[in-house]
Amino acid sequence: MDESALLDLLECPVCLERLDASAKVLPCQHTFCKRCLLGIVSSRKELRCPECRTLVECGVDELPSNILLVRLLDGIRQRPRKAGDGGSAGNSTNALRAQGSVTTNGGLNDAQNTQSGQQRIQARSPPVRGVPQLPCAKALYNYEGKEPGDLKFNKGDIIVLRRQVDENWYHGEINGIHGFFPTNFVQIIKPLPQPPPQCKALYDFEVKDKEADKDCLPFLKDDILTVIRRVDENWAEGMLGDKIGIFPISYVEFNSAAKQLIELDKPSGADTGEGSSGTSHSGNSQKQADAKKNTKKRHSFTSLTMSNKSSQSVQNRHSMEISPPVLISSSNPTAAARISELTGLSCSAPSQDMNPPLLPPPPMATPVITSASSGAAAVAQRNIIGPVEQVPHLRTSARPSVFIAIYPYIPRKEDELELRKGEMFLVFERCQDGWFKGTSMHTSKIGVFPGNYVAPVTRALTTATPAKVAMATATTSNVVNLVTPTPPGAPCQKLPVSGVEFAKTSSTNGVSPAGVPGCHIQTSPQSKVLLHMSGQMTVNQARNAVRTAAAHSQDRPTAAVTPIQAQTPAASALPQQAAASQQVPPPLSAPAAYINAAMNISRPSVPAASAASSALPTAAFEAESSWKSSSGLSGCSFSENVSAPLNSAANKQDKDSKKEKKGLLKLLSGASTKRKPRSSPPHSPTQEVEQTNSEAAAALEGAVGPDIVPVIVNGRAAPCTVDCDSVSASTPAQDNRKPASLDNNIPIAPPPRQPCSSLGSVLNDSRPCERYRVMVSYPPQSEAELELKEGDIVFVHKKREDGWFKGTLQRNGKTGLFPGSFVENI
């Protein structure tokens, strides 16, 4: 409180003039000026308290003075003299001494009451400088000033603080002179008051439907808003001019006072335990805000582009620019339910690339296919093999992606994750403000982190040297990696892929590394669709799928997995395999059943084998030694016979697969989606392209030379030569073994999983497309999204459940994702 306001309170209740040291206090403890009390006695012949009418029996001169009032006035009078130049009380340039001169140079007598009107005017003059009620500091040293504009003072002077320039400089005033001075030259007696909670607009925020959004507070960029309170996780209430409304937190930058207010008003339902984040409570904030705002405006989440900017400015997070406000009003309310389901996600989940290209046609002879993501391969190389938790309720509409930290990040809030450079993260939600929500594949913790600190991990060409490590990485993730066998003693090569180096090593024990050399696994287009479902299955569901697949395989010839030899394979091996597959398989132990189902399975049932292989628990690794010793077999003894009987058998299988497709779809979709059963998995827009590619591959299969092995790297075909003599030399007894024998040193890899086709390019899609016009421009938040400009025409291929569309932009021919609320059908 400044001095003028304080002196306004020290006034007589009768005459409303300022009290001085001559004021008297009555026995009832009410204080009045002496002049008023004398006037009452002279007119009434008695003295009663004007406030409570209590009779006073003594005279006015006998009444005591108010000690507290005297001390207060004394302090106001004496304080300015310490800041002066040593006793210059009569200096007229010092307004502070002019006000203090009311009670100086003489006793406090009744004659001064005649000057009360003049004193009252002086009391309401500009604030006294240096009084304790004002922010002030005491000079510890003499400061002469080094530049024009600096404030000069001597040791012991009292300086009134006006504002703080930064942590090292203040702007203050002394004796009517303003200037700057360093902080370390003074001692703060009373600090500056906290600034009001305000925020600065980073983007324009406009509302289209003023009737529906009447409680929103529109503003322009660089506007200064006064923050009133926090409404929920994503919205705050503020004032601009004479208007009060709510606005998105991600559109503004708060000052220090507003940050504290936002933190204090944080929703009480926010979890502080591991795996929690502010984004996972949008369901609670929705209930709280229904009375004030449309439900959709409260949730800034979608399955691909979401928002966790609730305290973005509080911690100075670096977020991506979003100019149109429709991003918030058009977000999907059902995303909150999906987020709550994903809060229990562990360190293991199927990984997908941001924008994987289409797979080329299956080659005649491909190397061993090992399911291991780049993050899992790194874990396996450190010999960290532990139990892998399963994700039973992960839906295909929210496929997680693997990212790698390219910069370190220290968390500033409880719901944030620490990023270490090179650490792998599984991202299952991406926010509209550029923040990601995911889980660390190293610590299994769940939280949010800045998206510009990580980069997507693409598929890599890698080899796992020990068989046990290869099995461990096979169950960690479902990203397809192709392993190229190399002869013994080959040097170690490192292949840089997207800034991350993965070691490509070869075995030194004379056995082809990490699997069966050159085994060829073919899948039909139907099975590729089923792979999406099988990749999400739990262990028990995978076991049931394996048993079902084994039961179905006895009615159809098996020609999917066949060995490759250096010479042209004999055609007589095919009937032998077909005859063997007609027999009912005997009961096997759990590991043997998985391997039998993975190796002896027909084309339509390959997805079931993929589910079984990709969902193998750690218990299968422990039982590895038992079935190795019981089998007593070594080497790869499967041969592939590319001949007319094989092609005719494959054509027959395609017909049979169409009949049983619906049954398998219902079986797998019912087992993998308990919460939301559906009759078929989501339709892949690239299914027709892949089917065409696989049919073309069957026609071109015989034209490929035996020494040329196409290798799939990041979804593209690349030539790679393999020395068939060295491959066959590593397994000298290969030609003499039966087709059903297994190598006790070779782990069985699951079939390749179809890439995330919902994010791939759909340039050859033959389905009818709908034409949409862009209403509001949309800046892309990731590589998988399209940049929309107002007036653009988009051909929509697919509409997703979360409100996002997939289509091709007519302007540049690019294909990607975009929010459906930004376009209208034409």
UniProtKB/Swiss-Prot annotation:
Per UniProt, subcellular location reads as: Cytoplasm, Perinuclear region; Cell projection, Lamellipodium; Golgi apparatus, trans-Golgi network
List the signal peptide residues. none
Instruction: List all Basic and acidic residues biased stretches.
Output: 652-663
Write out the catalysed reaction: S-ubiquitinyl-[E2 ubiquitin-conjugating enzyme]-L-cysteine + [acceptor protein]-L-lysine = [E2 ubiquitin-conjugating enzyme]-L-cysteine + N(6)-ubiquitinyl-[acceptor protein]-L-lysine
Biological pathway: Protein modification; protein ubiquitination
Q: Name one GO biological process term.
A: neuron migration
Keyword hit for Transferase = yes
* Domain called SH3: residue spans: 132-191, 194-257, 398-459, 767-826
A Gene Ontology term for the protein's cellular component: Golgi apparatus
Instruction: Check the record and name the CDD domains matching this protein.
Output: RING-HC_SH3RF1, SH3_SH3RF1_1, SH3_SH3RF1_3, SH3_SH3RF_C
Short name of any one Pfam family annotated for the protein: zf-RING_UBOX
For this chain, the Swiss-Prot or TrEMBL PTM comment says: Autoubiquitinated. Ubiquitinated by SH3RF2, leading to proteasome-mediated degradation.
Top EC class for this record: transferase
Give me the stretches of Polar residues compositional bias: 90-122, 301-317
The EC number(s) attached to this protein equal: 2.3.2.27
Low complexity bias locations: 273-285
Keyword rRNA-binding (UniProt): no
Picking any one GO molecular function of the record gives: zinc ion binding
Disordered: region residues? 80-130, 266-319, 647-694, 725-759
Q: Where are the zinc fingers (RING-type)?
A: 12-53
Q: Which domain of life is it from?
A: Eukaryota
Let me see what the UniProt entry remarks about domains: The RING finger domain is required for ubiquitin ligase activity and autoubiquitination.
- What's the family? Belongs to the SH3RF family.
The entry's function note states: Has E3 ubiquitin-protein ligase activity. In the absence of an external substrate, it can catalyze self-ubiquitination. Acts as a scaffold protein that contributes to the effective activation of the JNK signaling pathway. Plays an essential role in the anterior neural development.
The protein, known as: E3 ubiquitin-protein ligase SH3RF1
**Organism, as annotated:** Xenopus laevis
Q: Gene encoding this polypeptide?
A: sh3rf1
